[in-house]
Swiss-Prot record:
This is UPF0178 protein Clos_2709. It comes from Alkaliphilus oremlandii (strain OhILAs). It comes from the Bacteria. Belongs to the UPF0178 family. Pfam families: DUF188 (PF02639). Transmembrane segments: none annotated. NCBIfam families: PRK00124.1. InterPro entries: UPF0178 (IPR003791).
Amino acid sequence: MKILVDADGCPVKDIILKIAKKYHIKVVMVKNICHELHDDYAEIITVDQGRDVADITLINHTEKGDIVITQDYGVAAMALAKNAHAIHQNGWAYTDENIDELLMKRHMGQEIRRKHKKYTKIPKRTKEDDLQFERFLIHYLDENILKIRGHQDEI
């Protein structure tokens, strides 16, 4: 089991690393060449810039039982299809029950933006957002780590 991070624009990389070290979980961060990222604990995979290159690379490194941390609903859907776990950087899990609705909302939002050329402003991330993610990831690992690590025996 490992944690894979869609690292381009991910605001919780430091939190992920802190928790992964505590739980002795390998971390793989995938980023494109436009972002600088260095860490002695995590494996950093750097890919060319291009549409979905980092996303496809991340999914190609994902295995059953892994945890993928991403804000991209499409990446989350592909992770779930590989029987991996998917977590949003705001501290909630993507599931088979919510992914279809999330993808539909994303599609509808894209259509509206394309039609009206109107874009919403994303609110600035707060310290509380980071705390919520940290609490969620710890709780998620505490609740699921035995199940997740149990999948390793099946591989």
